[in-house]
């Protein structure tokens, strides 16, 4: 018994019935060359598919009568899988990039981190800004708030602040996302 004829329940079997799984008495048949054959009984369509050494696959079960095509089911499944993989590749996963600052971060370092932040946002990633306080810096949290405000001002209108600066232990955290393009 060929593997394709097993009664294993897979998502593909649920979507496209083939050969003996088709239960309707009459079907509209499309030949293996893509030409319309016409409306045939299920048995005639199965005989025609078997004659060509191919499968009868139900393409549109909602149509009246259902549309079936004579094709190689294994190849059809492979093509569907390939299309699904291509669609999956095209979707970009949004990553969260983290940049760490100190309230006393030097101007050169600040500019480099700002440039990296812009690049991450242009690529569509979110940025987590982390301003870390050490020792007595905790008593000067206003420096951290000023740093967060400066970052927000320097990035301009191209961003959305997802979460305002908030204190978590010894660090101030702020989330920035790119503005959606319309």
From Swiss-Prot:
One GO CC term, this protein: cytosol
Cross-referenced Gene3D superfamilies: Translation initiation factor 3 (IF-3), C-terminal domain, Translation initiation factor 3 (IF-3), N-terminal domain
Name by which UniProt lists this protein: Translation initiation factor IF-3
InterPro entries cross-referenced by the UniProt entry: T_IF-3_C_sf, T_IF-3_N_sf, Translation_initiation_fac3_CS, Translation_initiation_fac_3, Translation_initiation_fac_3_C, Translation_initiation_fac_3_N
Biological processes per GO annotation: ribosome disassembly
One GO molecular-function entry: translation initiation factor activity
Encoding gene (name): infC
Keyword field: Cytoplasm, Initiation factor, Protein biosynthesis
Top-rank taxon: Bacteria
S-S pairs: none
Region (Disordered): 1-22
Functional note: IF-3 binds to the 30S ribosomal subunit and shifts the equilibrium between 70S ribosomes and their 50S and 30S subunits in favor of the free subunits, thus enhancing the availability of 30S subunits on which protein synthesis initiation begins.
Protein family membership: Belongs to the IF-3 family.
Organism: Xanthomonas campestris pv. campestris (strain ATCC 33913 / DSM 3586 / NCPPB 528 / LMG 568 / P 25)
Major localization class: cytoplasm
Entry's localization field: Cytoplasm
PANTHER family to which the protein is assigned, alphabetical: TRANSLATION INITIATION FACTOR IF-3 (PTHR10938), TRANSLATION INITIATION FACTOR IF-3, MITOCHONDRIAL (PTHR10938:SF0)
Quaternary structure, from the entry: Monomer.
